[in-house]
Amino acid sequence: MDYQDTLGWLFGLETMGIKLGLQNITELLHRMGDPQEQFRSVHVAGSNGKGSVSAMTESILRHQGYRAGLYTSPHLVDFRERIQINGVVIPEETLCRLVEELRGHVEDMNLVSKESHPTFFEVTTALAFSHFAESGVEVAAVEVGMGGRLDATNVISPDCTIITRISLEHTKYLGNNLVQIAGEKAGIIKSGVSVITAESSESEAFSVIAEAAKEKGCPVRVVGQDIQWRLIGSSLQGTLMSIGDIGEVRLPLLGSFQGANAAMAYGAARELNRRGLEIEDDAIARGLSNVRWPGRLEIVGTMPHVVFDVSHTPDGAKAVAEDLDRLFSQKVVLILGVLDDKDLDGIAGHFGRISKCAIATAPATPRAYPAERVAESLRGHVPKVVVELSVVEALRKGLAKASVDDVLLVTGSLYTVGEAKAWWDLREAR
């Protein structure tokens, strides 16, 4: 198969839907020689910031000189973004070769029973781990796909566990309240492995995490208590902060909320130190100062300012809205598209507060809320709301509406931002 055929086969697996559980991924990896046992790892779960924390952790490891892997999901524009080594996406030819090998095992498993057929995410996870193993990755930052306890990534034996802030999400699969969702995410905690979290020690979610850690004999380190950091300033040039005992660091990522994410990555580096992986202060500082993570309060254009942000929970929307209030004096032109397993009304409320007008849209996935439903949520918060079915057409319309002094915000989902970014990148390349 060539590259496009390979992608076609992979994405064809999405018809298998979502099947949470570890039996199939365990069998598939065993047939591949258990590649997950050939590298060390940091496992990252949570609702807000887990991708950013994973990227920061990988950047720190790379700047220390380790051969570092990064596995995240979903992707923004290119599938290969999900699987990186030292900041380089998996090559097309490597992807094709490994998928061809995986396909044989998948077809063999399908002969056993339809229930044993691996899903898209399980195959993608096996692909990532195989690439890491054969490429000599020493340590990888691995982001959970959904939940944690039954997520396909939960076959690794990490050196550190990170759980970011938790919000209501994926309620169809993870539970209808924060306690249930926290229980699923705490399912990645392994016996004797330290847990780092940004959850408030007063929250219900933290109580669940702490209890799970206690049962497995794991110390818990809380950002803001055990791991200290301080925001010095946030501007269009980045986020200046003081962290732990390494002093001032300037993150290239915008948003004061990135400070807590950086503190978790710093905490992971310190824990890896304790477990025998040398990571110097300079590597932490350089890793954080040079991290790249597109689609997170990313300014891609000026006159007007065009901002892409993948926030998909009310907590994330609130944090981004507060930062945009600080960074810009004017109200924004909002383009919003949200998946149907998210808290649309909560997201719309926070973004609506800072918007003078809005374009409701929907990314091209059956999982998205219809654009008209998004508009309904926005109308109670924004003076003027219009509907545009296509994300690209919404962006075109937003650019036409915005004056040179305006801020145009595209947000609500990684899928929404991904479609906008793909079009924007092509436009800029002309």
Predicted feature descriptions by range:
Residues S413:
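Active-site-proximal loop/hinge segments that shape catalytic or ion-binding/gating pockets
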Residues Q38, E134, V139-V144, D151-I162, ...:
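Nucleotide phosphate-binding/pyrophosphate-handling subdomain across enzymes
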Residues T124-Y173, F206-E248:
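Extended acidic/charged loop-beta regions that coordinate divalent cations
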Residues E199-G217, R221, L236-Q237, H305-F308, ...:
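C-terminal helical cap/extension that packs against the catalytic core
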Residues T57-R62, F132, F351, L378:
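Hydrophobic alpha-helical packing residues
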Residues L22, T26-H30, D34-E37, H63-I156, ...:
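ATP-dependent carboxylate-amine ligase catalytic core
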Residues M1-N48, S52-R67, L76-D78, S194-E204:
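N-terminal leader/targeting and accessory segments in enzymes
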Residues Y71-T72, T197-S200, A212-S234, L251-S256, ...:
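Beta-strand->loop->alpha-helix junctions that form or flank phosphate-binding loops
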